[in-house]
């Protein structure tokens, strides 16, 4: 492995990076799927937990905290309810991982060619991370929207299958329906991924010397810290994205049937602030951070491990030849 922050930038062939990124996304998604469903349910809940009066007209469930929400879902929908939306999510995570790591590697290598105008290492990591995140988010956004809508379904199913959901959205909402909330997603993910990769590259070298870290390795620990700090800063846009993704003709058919009608990122933010206060923008933050830690640790550890295995396999194959 290369020293310092260069390890993600120039190690491995393009094929190895693509495969390692895809594997990392696949494994990470399956592990954190239950937390993702819980987070989405909490983000779409608009009534106040501290105000019983706001519960009077609620026809759906009232979720209170991560563990109780998980128990409610299992009791009402079965254990499989915690993996709702997992098929589009798995597809999204694999494609996202491939595009993200490939774009990050390509961008950093391109920036390295700017000898005269070379950016500082932290700035290079920020630019490459933001570029990779923006491209990956825009490219996989329809799958992200489908993941959210399936996770928001209760026992009354809005969509019966992945293909039927694609047909229904295309027929009833047009192709623009697949990109509801995309501006919030890109507005969130570009600074998020920039902050994530810059923090990750900065923390990994000093953490690499410690063997007994809580998450097992310097790669994993750096990934956890980078993800948690970046996600906290950008969380309001993530919540707005989820609220916008369930807009349209099926808005009142999901598990929470009282989701308001929102239009645009800024109008959504103003309406949430006016009706729910600043805390309304952070619903689901706790479970999101719980999810961020294992997701980032698993993603970065799986990526690094897969990349090393692929490199070792190539070396072994070349020796046989």
From Swiss-Prot:
Cellular component GO terms held in the UniProt record: mitochondrial inner membrane
Report the subcellular localization: Mitochondrion inner membrane
Q: Which UniProt keywords apply?
A: Membrane, Mitochondrion, Mitochondrion inner membrane, Repeat, Transmembrane, Transmembrane helix, Transport
What's one Pfam family here? Mito_carr
Topological relation to the membrane, as annotated: Multi-pass membrane protein
GO term, biological process aspect, one: transmembrane transport
Question: InterPro entries attached here?
Answer: Mit_carrier, Mitochondrial_sb/sol_carrier, Mt_carrier_dom_sf
Write out the ranges of the repeats annotated as Solcar: 12-110, 120-206, 214-309
Give me the segments passing through the membrane: 12-28, 91-107, 126-146, 184-200, 221-237, 284-301
What does UniProt give as the signal peptide span? Answer: none
Can you tell which superkingdom this protein's organism belongs to? Answer: Eukaryota
**Family of the protein in this entry:** Belongs to the mitochondrial carrier (TC 2.A.29) family.
What the protein does comes down to: Mitochondrial transporter that mediates uptake of thiamine pyrophosphate (ThPP) into mitochondria.
UniProt cross-references to PANTHER family, sorted A to Z: SOLUTE CARRIER FAMILY 25 (PTHR24089)
- Its name, as the record gives it, is Mitochondrial thiamine pyrophosphate carrier 1
């Amino acid at each position: 492995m290369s020293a310092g922050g260069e390890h993600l930038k120039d190690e491995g062939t393009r094929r190895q990076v693509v495969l390692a990124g895809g594997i990392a996304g696949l494994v990470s998604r399956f592990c954190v799927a239950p937390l993702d469903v819980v987070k989405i349910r909490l983000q779409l809940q608009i009534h106040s937990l501290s105000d019983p009066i706001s519960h009077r007209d609620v026809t759906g469930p009232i979720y209170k905290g991560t563990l109780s929400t998980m128990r409610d879902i299992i009791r009402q929908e079965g254990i499989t309810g915690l993996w709702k939306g997992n098929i589009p999510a798995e597809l999204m995570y694999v494609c996202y991982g491939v595009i993200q790591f490939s774009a990050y590697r390509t961008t950093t290598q391109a920036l390295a060619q700017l000898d005269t105008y070379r950016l500082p290492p932290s700035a290079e990591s920020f630019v490459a991370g933001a570029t990779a995140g923006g491209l990956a988010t825009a490219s996989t956004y329809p799958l992200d929207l489908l993941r959210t809508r399936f996770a928001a379904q209760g026992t009354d199913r809005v969509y019966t299958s992945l293909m039927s959901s694609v047909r229904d959205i295309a027929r009833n909402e047009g192709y623009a329906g697949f990109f509801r909330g995309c501006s919030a997603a890109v507005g969130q993910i570009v600074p998020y991924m920039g902050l994530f990769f810059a923090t990750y590259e900065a923390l990994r070298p000093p953490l690499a010397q410690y063997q007994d870290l809580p998450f097992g390795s310097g790669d994993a620990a750096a990934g956890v810290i980078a993800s948690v700090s970046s996600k906290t800063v950008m969380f309001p846009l993530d919540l707005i994205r989820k609220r916008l993704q369930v807009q349209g003709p099926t808005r009142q058919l999901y598990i929470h049937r009282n989701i308001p009608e929102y239009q645009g990122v800024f109008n959504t933010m103003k309406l949430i602030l006016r009706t729910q206060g600043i805390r309304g923008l952070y619903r689901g933050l706790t479970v999101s951070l719980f999810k961020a830690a294992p997701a980032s640790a698993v993603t970065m550890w799986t990526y690094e491990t897969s990349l090393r295995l692929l490199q070792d396999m190539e070396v072994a194959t070349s020796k046989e030849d």
